[in-house]
Amino acid sequence: MQEEILYKWNYDDFKDKKFKIPKLNMPWDYKFSPYFEEISLENREWIKGTKLISEESDFEKFVYLKTILMNSYLYPHCNKEVFRYINRLNEYIYIVDDFYLEDNVKGQEWVDELFDRNSKFVKENYIGSIMWEIFDDIISVGNDGATDYLIKKTHEWMDSVILFNSKKVNSKFTFEEYTNSRGVDVGMIFGLACTKVHIPPLCDEIENHPVYIDMLANYYNPIHLLINDIYSFNKETKSVRLGNYVKIAAYQLGSIQLAMDHLSKLFDEYIGKIQEKFAELEKIFPNNKDLETHLYIIKTIIACNFNCSTNPNYPRYYGEVLEAELKIINE
């Protein structure tokens, strides 16, 4: 067992590098967008036209990652127009994350300027103007209130990425400490906000209820972190960052396989707990159709994230690290 507090990961610390990724027990069914093929045809040209990725080699590597595949899993209930623009927002987010935030090129001041629509930065910089153009497109096919909520959650996601980049995660972290340090940077609170633009909104009484807030923050978000960390671990073994709980648990338990098994057990526990929260909400708000719709969407997003993450055709988890990510490997 590890006694020293470590702040960096070294794959060579483990003599036995063999491990089997566990098959998680998923209680819900996944869906897939019927517009995947059609929107895929235009997606490449749209990304290229944004000029968000300056190097041709980086552009080709990004397209190879097939992020639209994950988007097609996460947003299967959207009609074609909503899916087109939600997909564009998600592609934009992936690009900003990979090339502007994860390697610490940009910081909090840059993000705050990005979300000030009247700022000189937005008016003069295509990175800002593209984002607001996407939001306008979403408003045109969705509803204003839900898009305002989406803008807020997009901002919160970027804030979390920057905050986590500044955190000193160490090998003694409990899972709760780790999830608190990650905030919402895994992106699935943002993902849920994306689905809200085309479904009836929850009333404020439910949206602001302590049980609903607790369910999202302490169960829904950690479940996605567990999925992310288990299935992205292969890709992240080269990075010295401890930003994956498999790495932290491996140091604590002395084995990568024991760490994988531990996260699998945590996943089962959190799935059980979130189901209890669903039942509690349905008891507090009986026969509420909007709540039923939102809980169904939440279950579907979890199942879809899981199924895409385990799909060998999804290179973002099964492929090589992007050049932008390689820059931070030995920091």
Swiss-Prot record:
One of its GO terms (molecular function) is lyase activity. Belongs to the terpene synthase family. Gene3D superfamilies: Farnesyl Diphosphate Synthase (1.10.600.10). It is an enzyme of class 4 (lyase). SUPFAM superfamilies: Terpenoid synthases (SSF48576). Contains several highly conserved motifs that are important for catalytic activity including the aspartate-rich 'DDxx(x)D/E' motif and the 'NDxxSxxxD/E' motif, both of which are involved in complexing metal ions to coordinate the binding of the isoprenyl diphosphate substrate in the active site. A motif (DDxx(x)D/E motif) lies at residues 97-102. Terpene synthase that converts its substrate farnesyl diphosphate (FPP) into several yet unidentified sesquiterpenes. Keywords: Lyase, Metal-binding. A motif (NDxxSxxxD/E motif) lies at residues 228-236. The keyword tRNA processing does not apply. Its EC number is 4.2.3.-. This is Terpene synthase 8.
